[in-house]
């Protein structure tokens, strides 16, 4: 696929001189160079915060985490509230707002939806660059009057989700939500800008069975796995049932009933 032929080297750059110090700090923290003429991606620091820009003539626009405006705001205001499928999948009901661990946080979109509906969220992201975007987006959102209270319900952890779940200390999450990167083979899956940018960097979650196993061992009430609608279930324990939408479905693995 042409979209993946670009090099996967990454450099950090400031979009204006006043962001140079921040860019250098991120470069040091992420272990990335400030100059790399062969890089296929740039981590850019500017007025809109941190963003990742794929380089090259046909590259899509930059990817950043923005919980205040754009898609996240539209979904928060008009997405269907507690009636939307993800809410039903994790067990949101009258008087029930479960504690949820999103073990494959990505850019935090699903976690933000659940937090906006009142769930206490813990997020794990294993890819340091995506985790950095998420951290930056959460930090900017905390200063916003409308969404500041929502993101206060979102706690970000970094590292390997399987290892973190196996070594979990303290109260277990009631619900664990998984959305592993599925190995797509058709170009339609790469239409979304985020997919085009991150698939070469992140790859597919080939350890999905181990991820599910660790989640089932830790969750106190249920595990929910989001999959493309026609994708096979993850190898291992079979889900009890699924909720199916137009393009995706939620496989549900219950352990015990959620109560208010």
UniProtKB/Swiss-Prot annotation:
InterPro entries (UniProt xref): 16SrRNA_methylTrfase_J, SAM-dependent_MTases_sf
Binding site for S-adenosyl-L-methionine: 125-126, 179
Reactions it catalyzes: guanosine(1516) in 16S rRNA + S-adenosyl-L-methionine = N(2)-methylguanosine(1516) in 16S rRNA + S-adenosyl-L-homocysteine + H(+)
Keyword Nucleus: no
Superkingdom assignment: Bacteria
Keyword hit for Membrane: no
Keywords attached to this entry: Cytoplasm, Methyltransferase, rRNA processing, S-adenosyl-L-methionine, Transferase
Chief location category: cytoplasm
One Pfam family recorded for the sequence: SAM_MT
Entry GO MF terms: rRNA (guanine-N2-)-methyltransferase activity
HAMAP family: 16SrRNA_methyltr_J (MF_01523)
Annotated family: Belongs to the methyltransferase superfamily. RsmJ family.
PANTHER family: RIBOSOMAL RNA SMALL SUBUNIT METHYLTRANSFERASE J
Function per UniProt: Specifically methylates the guanosine in position 1516 of 16S rRNA.
Protein name: Ribosomal RNA small subunit methyltransferase J
Originating organism: Pseudomonas entomophila (strain L48)
Lineage, uppermost ranks: Bacteria, Pseudomonadati, Pseudomonadota, Gammaproteobacteria, Pseudomonadales
Gene that specifies this protein: rsmJ
């Amino acid at each position: 696929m042409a979209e993946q032929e670009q090099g996967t080297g990454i450099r950090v750059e400031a979009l204006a001189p006043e962001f140079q110090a921040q860019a250098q700090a991120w470069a040091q923290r992420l272990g990335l160079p400030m100059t790399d003429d062969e890089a296929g991606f740039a981590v850019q620091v500017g007025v809109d915060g941190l963003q990742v820009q794929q380089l090259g003539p046909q590259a899509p626009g930059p990817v950043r985490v923005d919980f205040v405006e754009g898609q996240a705001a539209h979904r928060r205001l008009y997405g269907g509230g507690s009636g939307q499928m993800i809410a039903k999948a994790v067990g949101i009901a009258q008087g029930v707002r479960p504690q949820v661990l999103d073990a494959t946080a990505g850019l935090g979109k699903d976690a933000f939806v659940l937090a906006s509906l009142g769930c206490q969220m813990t997020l794990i992201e294993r890819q340091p660059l995506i985790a950095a975007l998420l951290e930056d987006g959460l930090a900017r959102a905390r200063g916003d009057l409308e969404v500041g209270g929502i993101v206060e319900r979102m706690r970000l952890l970094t590292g390997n989700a399987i290892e973190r779940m196996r070594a979990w200390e303290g109260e277990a999450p009631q619900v664990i939500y998984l959305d592993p990167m599925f190995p797509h083979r058709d170009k339609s899956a790469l239409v979304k800008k985020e997919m085009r940018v991150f698939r070469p960097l992140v790859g597919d979650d080939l350890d999905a069975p181990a991820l599910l196993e660790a989640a089932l061992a830790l969750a106190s009430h249920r595990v929910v796995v989001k999959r493309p609608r026609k994708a096979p279930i993850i190898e291992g324990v079979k889900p009890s049932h699924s909720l199916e939408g137009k393009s995706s479905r939620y496989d549900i693995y219950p352990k015990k009933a959620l109560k208010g």
